[in-house]
């Protein structure tokens, strides 16, 4: 049988290659390091953790923790290895990064069905089953080839994403639903500022601390010229925002009947109205600063952020246009994608993408139908989101409870709601796996800590 090709030896590619070999099929894993250097990597190991050593919260009533549990049940190599190399980190799953990557490298290099080739693939293979898992720093040559394959508008090279907040955390006594001049459907939540509120917000925004750029981002400042951070707009003058993204024209505050001094608008991100995007708030502020400053917006005092604003180098596909929820390309079903290049964020999401793409690559090789995970699971919700989101405004998304379908019976208390999401996800995963004849590993669930959840810990 012709080997399956996996391009990229990060978390997603490593997981994908393992799942293919686990299915008893030969796989060739291409990793360009150390022959071709990456601006962010420091070793030649597979699955090197280039940023934090943390896989996020461990508790099953947190979004990332639920994804950990799902992947443990599904037999993820990445999560199993992370569990073996844990270091103390409070409620987070953090690892000894050197031992973690070294074990994964040795595991794949010593597997009889895995061939690791240390060379760059400048072009997508024209035939065979292929998993693309090249990550946010895809090489220039392969990026150019991907642009030719997908079309110039369907591959991005940097994130310029605004924060997203949970709809239930927005104060609807202050924020009001309307469109400018009442044209068409009332599509935006509008947060009205008084002159005093705007002045305080503008001052805090100008003084807020920005996240430092990495060396390779600083050297390529053109990535940021097309989409100026909101804090840079603010520094151009006190009225720049008020005549730009915070302009109040065409809107009236229903509490006063008057036009506000300024207005911050939020646009619905999902069909259920659970997630709302701060329009025009692409930012490079530190995450703690974003929460502090953006909670000064009237109506967002208690806002729960599920994605922070980012601006950084990141190669990713316009997944809603290109990918199915099975992670297959719509126009070439034998080509699959996994990891950050699909528009998911975080180590655990990358492992989940590697699991699904690798599993489906093996199924395609055996003539079986590809899998689509239930959208009520965290993994399934992620892949459903990236394959169905609005393509014109698509930006990468981390695991969060806001992308899950609403519960049949609404639960007001956050801790109980998250626990209900978890219970439904794991139940539906078990039912689905049984129907698909997939073995699941037994899970030992941790307890839910309502106080920690309500506090946002």
From Swiss-Prot:
Pfam families in UniProt: GIDA (PF01134)
Identification of the protein by name: Methylenetetrahydrofolate--tRNA-(uracil-5-)-methyltransferase TrmFO
Its Enzyme Commission number(s) read: 2.1.1.74
What does this protein do, in the record's words?
Catalyzes the folate-dependent formation of 5-methyl-uridine at position 54 (M-5-U54) in all tRNAs.
Family, per the entry? Belongs to the MnmG family. TrmFO subfamily.
Q: State its cofactor.
A: FAD
Q: Name one GO biological process term.
A: tRNA methylation
Q: Where in the cell is it found?
A: Cytoplasm
Among NCBIfam families, the record links this protein to:
gid_trmFO, PRK05335.1
Organism listed in the record: Thermosynechococcus vestitus (strain NIES-2133 / IAM M-273 / BP-1)
* Reactions performed catalytically: uridine(54) in tRNA + (6R)-5,10-methylene-5,6,7,8-tetrahydrofolate + NADH + H(+) = 5-methyluridine(54) in tRNA + (6S)-5,6,7,8-tetrahydrofolate + NAD(+); uridine(54) in tRNA + (6R)-5,10-methylene-5,6,7,8-tetrahydrofolate + NADPH + H(+) = 5-methyluridine(54) in tRNA + (6S)-5,6,7,8-tetrahydrofolate + NADP(+)
Please give the Gene Ontology molecular function terms for this protein: flavin adenine dinucleotide binding; tRNA (uracil(54)-C5)-methyltransferase activity, 5,10-methylenetetrahydrofolate-dependent
Please tell me which top-level EC class this enzyme sits in. Answer: transferase
**Key words, A-Z:** Cytoplasm, FAD, Flavoprotein, Methyltransferase, NAD, NADP, Transferase, tRNA processing
Q: Which InterPro entries match?
A: FAD/NAD-bd_sf, MnmG-rel, MnmG-rel_CS, MnmG_N, TrmFO
| UniProt keyword rRNA processing present | no
Question: Looking at the UniProt record for this protein, which Gene Ontology cellular component terms does it annotate, in alphabetical order?
Answer: cytosol
Query: Is NAD included in the keywords of this UniProt record?
Result: yes
Q: Where does FAD bind?
A: 8-13
Query: Upper taxonomic classification of the species?
Result: Bacteria, Bacillati, Cyanobacteriota, Cyanophyceae, Acaryochloridales
């Amino acid at each position: 049988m012709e080997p399956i090709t996996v391009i990229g030896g990060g978390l997603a590619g490593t997981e994908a290659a393992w799942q293919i070999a686990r299915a008893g099929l030969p796989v060739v894993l291409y990793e360009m390091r150390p022959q071709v250097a990456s601006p962010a990597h420091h070793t030649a190991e597979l699955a090197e953790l280039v940023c934090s050593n943390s896989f996020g919260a461990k508790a099953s009533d947190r979004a990332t923790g639920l994804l950990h549990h799902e992947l443990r049940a599904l037999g993820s190599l990445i999560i199993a290895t992370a569990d073996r190399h844990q270091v103390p980190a409070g409620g987070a799953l953090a690892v000894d990064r050197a031992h973690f990557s070294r074990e994964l490298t040795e595991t794949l290099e010593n597997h009889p069905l895995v061939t690791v080739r240390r060379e760059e693939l400048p072009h997508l293979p024209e035939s065979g089953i292929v998993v693309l898992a090249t990550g946010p720093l895809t090489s220039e040559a392969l990026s150019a080839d991907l642009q030719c394959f997908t079309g110039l508008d369907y591959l991005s090279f940097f994130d310029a994403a605004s924060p997203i907040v949970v709809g239930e955390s927005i104060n609807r006594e202050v924020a009001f639903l309307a469109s400018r001049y009442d044209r068409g459907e009332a599509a935006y939540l509008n947060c009205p500022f008084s002159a005093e509120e705007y002045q305080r917000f503008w001052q805090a925004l100008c003084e807020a601390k920005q996240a430092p750029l990495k060396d390779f981002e600083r050297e390529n400042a053109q990535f940021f010229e097309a989409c100026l951070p909101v804090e840079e707009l603010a520094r151009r003058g006190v009225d720049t925002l008020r005549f730009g993204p915070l302009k109040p024209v065409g809107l009236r505050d229903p509490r006063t009947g008057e036009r506000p001094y300024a207005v911050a608008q939020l646009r619905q991100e999902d069909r259920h109205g659970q997630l709302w995007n701060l329009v025009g708030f692409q930012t490079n502020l530190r995450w703690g600063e974003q929460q502090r400053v953006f909670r000064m917006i009237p109506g967002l005092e208690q806002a729960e952020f599920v994605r922070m604003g980012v601006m950084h180098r990141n190669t990713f596909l316009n997944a809603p246009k290109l990918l199915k929820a099975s992670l297959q390309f719509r126009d070439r079903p034998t080509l699959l994608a996994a990891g950050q290049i699909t528009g998911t964020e975080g180590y655990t999401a990358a492992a989940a993408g590697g699991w699904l793409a690798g599993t489906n690559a093996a199924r395609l090789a055996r003539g079986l139908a590809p899998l689509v995970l239930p959208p009520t699971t965290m993994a399934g919700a992620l892949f459903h989101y990236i394959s169905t989101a609005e393509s014109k405004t698509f930006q990468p998304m981390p695991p969060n409870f806001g992308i899950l379908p609403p519960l049949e019976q609404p639960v007001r208390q956050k801790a109980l709601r998250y626990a209900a999401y978890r219970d439904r996800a794991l139940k539906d995963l078990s039912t689905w796996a049984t129907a698909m004849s997939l073995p699941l590993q037994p899970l030992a669930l941790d307890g839910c800590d309502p106080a920690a959840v309500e506090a946002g810990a």
